[in-house]
Amino acid sequence: MSMRRIVLALVAIVAFAITGKAQSNSDRLSLGVGCLYQNGLDLTLSYEHEGKYHHAWEFFANGYIKWAECASCKHICPESFWKNYRSYGFGIAYKPCVVRGRNHYGNVRIGASAGSDTRRFLGGIHLGYEHNYVLRGGWQLFCQVKTDLMIKGEDLFRTGIVLGVKLPLN
């Protein structure tokens, strides 16, 4: 009887060891949408590779729209929203973990990007804080406070909040 329990315990340990992982070396696809000061809307699609202790590298594509009030109707109309100022960028960010909890963790986000608006080249330096909430199945919700320094952009500083979801790839 004791030999049977030992074998059963070993099988259970091996099964849990094979299927369980502590969220290291995992890959995620994330989508975030947010509002930035002043009159900006931000959309970010990114691939994130997480290493040990929740430190991560993020490769991202970012789109930005800055809307204005229409001169003729004094409201925000489709013309003044979609065609006022637009930019896009591609970049990389390193995210070291600074806070860890049971089902959440926080990262400082440090990165750089290159892109364009409709007329010229843009460079960007990105700083911020991202807090992640881990759900079942590896899904994550995140809230990101970001500040972007845009070189040669219409607006030098962009700051705001982005909310999003991360989907596991492996």
Please name every model-derived segment.
Residues 21-67, 166-170:
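Short glycine/proline- and aromatic-enriched beta-strand/turn motifs that initiate or cap beta-hairpins
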Residues 58-117, 123, 132-133, 141-168:
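Outer-membrane beta-barrel translocator/channel fold
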Residues 13-19, 106-108, 130:
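A broad helix-preferring feature
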Residues 25-27, 39, 53-55, 100-104, ...:
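Short coil turns and loop connectors of transmembrane beta-barrels in diderm outer membranes
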Residues 15, 24, 48-50, 97-101, ...:
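Generic structural signal for beta-strand residues in well-ordered domains
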Residues 125-127:
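Charged helix-capping and loop-helix junction motifs
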Residues 1-26, 169-170:
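Cleavable N-terminal export/targeting peptides
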